[in-house]
Curated annotation (Swiss-Prot):
Protein name: Small ribosomal subunit protein uS14c
Cellular location(s): Plastid, Chloroplast
Family under the similarity heading: Belongs to the universal ribosomal protein uS14 family.
PROSITE patterns, A to Z: RIBOSOMAL_S14 (PS00527)
GO terms (BP aspect): translation
Amino acid sequence: MAKKSMIEREKKRQKLVAKYAELRKEIKEQMRLASSFEEKLNLHRKLQRLPRNSSSTRLHNRCAISGRPKAYYRDFGLSRHVFREMAHNCLLPGVTKSSW
C-alpha cells in the first residue's frame, strides 16, 4: 500500500494539470504561430512561470485500490497484485486464466 501522502500528492498534480491545461495549450499554440524569436522567448518564459506540477508529464499512473505506482495495467487501472487477486476472486468480468 502506498503512503497516503503520495496518493494525495498525485491527486493534487492531477488537479493542477486540469486547471492549467487550457492555458498551456494556448501558450503553445501562440509559440507555434509566433514569427519573431523574441516573441517566442517571451512566450517560453510565460510557459516556464506556470507551476511545475501543472505539466502532464509529471503525472504517474497509480493503482486505484492500493496506490502502487509500478506494474500498472492501464486497461483496468489496477496494479498486477490487485489485478491477480481480483481475477482469482472472479471480481473482473470477462477475465479468465489462460491455459494451453
